Amino acid sequence: MSRRRRVYEGKAKVLYEGPEPGTLIQHFKDDATAFDAQKRATIEGKGVLNNRISEFIFTRLNEIGVPTHFIRALNMREQLIREVEIIPCEVVVRNVAAGSLSKRLGIDEGTVLPRSIIEFYYKNDELHDPMVSEEHITAFGWATPQEIDDMMALALRINDFLTGLFLGIGIRLVDFKVEFGRLYEGEMVRVVLADEISPDCCRLWDTRTNDKMDKDRFRRDMGGLIEAYSEVARRLGILFENEPKRSGPKLVK
């Protein structure tokens, strides 16, 4: 097997050179991180679950006309994607108060928000991904006003789709984080959904019990992360050829 050229490695994924120009292979790792990677562990099977869940969601989004970087699945851990220029701003959509919003504004966790709220965060681990305004984004040239409009419109479409998808399987979509990129097609440039959508970047609560089914289980030392992610996959109807072996986190020194 020929050795692939590594293009980029992040906290949870590795990007390799793809088979065709303008493509990449996105590989999902078993690494779990929280608090800007100050907390780390390796959780066996997490990468497989995130890959399969994200692949499922991106496929459905493509089908309803939401532009994404996803092309097709390759194997249990990898997918073929289009190469995009990542816009350095994370987009967070909140439906229910939780996490930093609850702390920042003193709103009880679990409070349903009057409407879905969109927030922007500058992607920079050293600065702890600070929250920024549209003014910051345009002033520093991270994105144009039109690109911001596109990201917000796509984020709300994704929110509508995911809210219905998860509600149908007994899961409440509390909030989620997405990233967007610029896809260059000849002289045309368009904003598309990139990165992933998985329990790593969504807050998912069981509608009946309010049990957390996302990465908060790792952040808050609750345990049972693989079991929770597996339950999300099962409810989505994703079948595994070989279900990931359940194991506890292995702390990385």
From Swiss-Prot:
Keywords from the named record: ATP-binding, Ligase, Nucleotide-binding, Purine biosynthesis
Alphabetical GO biological process terms: 'de novo' IMP biosynthetic process; cobalamin biosynthetic process
GO MF, one annotated term: phosphoribosylaminoimidazolesuccinocarboxamide synthase activity
Keyword Nucleotide-binding applies: yes
Signal peptide: none
InterPro entries, per database record: SAICAR_synt/ADE2_N, SAICAR_synt_PurC, SAICAR_synth, SAICAR_synthetase
Enzyme Commission (EC) number: 6.3.2.6
EC category name: ligase
Domain of life of the organism encoding this protein: Bacteria
Pfam families: SAICAR_synt
Pathway(s) this gene product operates in, as recorded in its UniProt entry: Purine metabolism; IMP biosynthesis via de novo pathway; 5-amino-1-(5-phospho-D-ribosyl)imidazole-4-carboxamide from 5-amino-1-(5-phospho-D-ribosyl)imidazole-4-carboxylate: step 1/2
A cellular component annotation (GO) from this entry: cytosol
Reactions performed catalytically: 5-amino-1-(5-phospho-D-ribosyl)imidazole-4-carboxylate + L-aspartate + ATP = (2S)-2-[5-amino-1-(5-phospho-beta-D-ribosyl)imidazole-4-carboxamido]succinate + ADP + phosphate + 2 H(+)
Gene3D superfamilies xrefs: ATP-grasp fold, B domain, Phosphorylase Kinase, domain 1
Family listed: Belongs to the SAICAR synthetase family.
Protein's name in the database: Phosphoribosylaminoimidazole-succinocarboxamide synthase
Biological source species: Parvibaculum lavamentivorans (strain DS-1 / DSM 13023 / NCIMB 13966)
